[in-house]
Amino acid sequence: MAIASTLREQAIAPLSRADAERLLPQLSLGRQTIEKRVLRARCLKYVESFDVSWAELTQLLPQVKDRLLAARVAVDLVHLAYYLVRGEEAERITKAAQDHAASDPFLLAELRLGRSINLTAANEVTGALQEARWAEDALGAAPKGRARDLVMTRLQRQLAHLLSHAADYDAARAAADATTRFAARVGDPWETAWATYTGGFVAWMAGRNDEAVDHFTRAEAPLSTYRTSLWRYTLLCLARSRMERGELAEGDRLARQSATGAPEDHGHFALLRGEAEVAELILARAPRGFPADEHFRDFVRGIVRAERGDPRKGVRMLEDVARELGSRGLEHWALGAGVHAAYWREQLVRGAGASRAAQLVRDIGARGGEGFAYYLPDVAVWLGRAAEREPSTRRLARTIRARGEAALRRASTDSEAPVGASELDGATFHLRAVGLTWRELGILRELERVRSEGQRLDRDALAARLGVSPNTLRVHLTRIRAKLDVGEKRGDEVLLEAALAQGSVA
């Protein structure tokens, strides 16, 4: 009886990814009770087997008679609905679970959190913030301990994202700091990496790209071992931050290696490279998405329309997008659309956009920001220059202008760097998963380049190309050999072949 009670408590309690990885091997053994099946399905959710977890929990929900256990199943289904894009079902499940979940502060907080996440996916940030605050209130009644810290770090993470979307950049930074503190208490490497990524996301949204690059770089290394979508998205965010700083070649390479990103993301990358016609093709070929997707695509379409010779239509599209996003609480994106619309108004009528620049910079600064959505350096330079005339905005305007000019200078010197596709791009995910560092990947990429040029592979020449000593190169190659497990095969060419073979791993 005591064992069953413990199993029931585990099935109901909040779980971390480390808990799930520890419990899963045990849960496949022995008699499969309802409690064990629920716990196993929940563990599968945390290791991102979303479809399997959804199928099992959906099957179990009508069979569970224990009210708290049924509420737990429903809460996890609400969270899964976000990952599987089943927002309508989340509404139905939430209504069914509310009464039972209300008797447990953890369940109620997680139910509200799940509701908030699904509203975020629908671009309803005002409602999502309200749900997140209600979750915070519910968690106030929960007993202190690891379970409370675990739910709190996820809640603060959600708040950090929402407050960034709402352009409350100072509050978002505070929430990101809280996420880091609570994650440290939990002691789960997954939550710690999530918290580091969150700090990067908040910094990027606020326009602090140097800080964002630092956070994303630190988050990427531990996340690469999990082989999950979060690692890919972190790479995408790192690519975006670097490209906005003018590091076009490296950013473009990272974006390809991430193998993720929506059409609007890749359209933005094309705009950063100065390829408006490519952005237009990307968006034209994209299938019609959910309404929430189209809001952001219309934003980029407006910029592209203006870049491609129809600024009047572009301005109208951008102003429509700004109103729509603002009505949903997405103030960060509404402000960004306003900046781009003002820039193109200035191109149409001298002074028409500049008259709005100071107010836009004032609004960004009052919220704790230093940039804008779908950042383009040339737009930033114009915005800073136009707003410098106003004493109250001069300091921030000069910062915005200086960063834009630095990005343009960097991009002009970076434009000659090769950004062609590499066969290693397709293998990057697997190579990072087996432990190769970015430095080691760079060595493999140089090996590939030497081979493509038809040159003889010579370690001294390779070391000179890489800017390292032959001894340092030897150490790196030895480590690559061990990680790729090439055995006794001789020659450095076998390292490249083994690395490229990783691209065919399912």
Set out the residue ranges of the language-model regions.
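Acidic, Ser/Thr-rich low-complexity linear motifs
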Residues: 144-149, 324-334, 365-382
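A structural signal for repeat-array scaffolds
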Residues: 1-35, 59-67, 144
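Short, basic, alpha-helical segments at the C-terminal edge of helix-turn-helix-like DNA-binding modules
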Residues: 488-503
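Tandem amphipathic alpha-helical repeat scaffolds
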Residues: 3-13, 35-49, 69-86, 107-125, ...
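Intrinsically disordered or compositionally simple regulatory linkers and C-terminal tails
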Residues: 388-433, 438, 506
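Single-residue signature of alpha-solenoid repeat helices
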Residues: 23, 53, 90, 128, ...
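Helix-turn-helix DNA-binding segment
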Residues: 419-483, 500-506
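Amphipathic alpha-helical segments of tetratricopeptide repeats
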Residues: 24-28, 58-62, 94-102, 133-144, ...
